[in-house]
């Protein structure tokens, strides 16, 4: 196994590799300015297109390419397995273009890793949100009724390995099997770290402060289902938010 950090500009040497896992993508957890949107696209769509061209001239047999559950858009209470259509909005279009940027020979087994919010002791998402809750100002976002696709870091990694080692192809939802609404998630975090969560961030305030990131990232509802992994026999170690929180806080 070889780890390579690549900005997508110069050519990449894939000699000797039979499989590639591409996890590139600039973090989207802040206000989406035009400058940042350009970075989002460059680090996802453009880099993936360049990688695809390199794979064409290589002996790579498997490509696992990052994507995100944002591809489904804001869908209310609709269940969203991998066969669900893409949604609308900037984030959904970005994710669709990201996946479409993969143009490799038909004999290259390709998997699109549609990942939700990754939770783990060292994950970026947990690092940012845990501070807010520990300060005693954590709370639900907007109405709190929006479904929040999430996954424990352990299952994120093991799920990727599972896709690599099994004949899985196409989109794969890397999310926990138990969906949670934002209000339920907030309650579980507060209970785990022994903090009350009386506050609620109003939707209008979040939109004013964070713009489209609030609208499409924090307040959008996506009840994503990991149907492909479940059908293939993957067993989640952390299927519930309560079990995930217990492990994270314990460590």
Predicted regions and their residues:
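Conserved Rossmann-fold NAD(P)-dependent oxidoreductase catalytic core, especially the SDR/UDP-sugar
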Residues: 49-89
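Alpha-helical substrate-binding/gating segment
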Residues: 130-138, 145-180
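Conserved beta-loop-beta element that borders a ligand/cofactor-binding pocket
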Residues: 67-68, 100-121
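NAD(P)H-binding glycine-rich loop region in Rossmannoid oxidoreductase-like domains
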Residues: 1-50
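Mid/C-terminal beta-alpha module of Rossmann-like enzyme folds, strongest
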Residues: 159, 166-212, 246-251
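Glycine-rich "substrate-gating" loop/helix at the edge of Rossmann-like oxidoreductase active sites
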Residues: 86-89, 116-123, 143-153
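C-terminal amphipathic/interface module of NAD(P)-dependent oxidoreductases
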Residues: 216-251
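Non-catalytic, hydrophobic alpha-helical segments
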Residues: 20, 153-160, 174, 185, ...
């Amino acid at each position: 196994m070889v780890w390579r950090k690549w900005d997508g500009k110069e050519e990449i040497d894939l000699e000797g590799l039979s499989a590639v896992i591409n996890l590139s993508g600039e973090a989207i957890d802040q206000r989406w300015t035009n400058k940042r949107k350009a970075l989002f696209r460059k680090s996802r769509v453009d880099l993936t297109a360049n990688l695809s061209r390199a794979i064409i001239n290589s002996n790579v047999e498997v490509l696992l390419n990052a994507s995100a559950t944002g591809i489904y858009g804001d869908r209310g209470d609709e269940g969203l397995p991998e066969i669900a259509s893409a949604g609308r909005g900037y984030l959904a279009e970005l994710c669709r273009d990201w996946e479409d940027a993969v143009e490799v020979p038909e004999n290259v087994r390709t998997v699109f890793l549609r990942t939700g919010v990754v939770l783990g002791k060292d994950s970026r998402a947990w690092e940012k949100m845990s501070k807010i809750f520990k300060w005693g100002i954590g709370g639900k976002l907007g109405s709190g009724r929006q479904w929040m696709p999430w996954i424990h870091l352990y299952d994120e990694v093991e799920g990727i390995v599972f896709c690599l080692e099994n004949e899985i192809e196409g989109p794969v939802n890397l999310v926990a099997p138990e969906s949670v609404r934002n209000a339920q998630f907030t309650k579980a975090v507060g209970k785990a770290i022994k903090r009350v969560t009386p506050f609620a961030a109003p939707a209008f305030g979040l939109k004013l402060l964070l713009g489209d990131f609030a609208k499409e990232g924090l307040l959008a509802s996506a009840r994503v289902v990991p149907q492909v992994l479940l059908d293939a026999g993957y067993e989640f170690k952390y299927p519930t938010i309560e079990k995930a929180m217990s492990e994270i806080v314990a460590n």
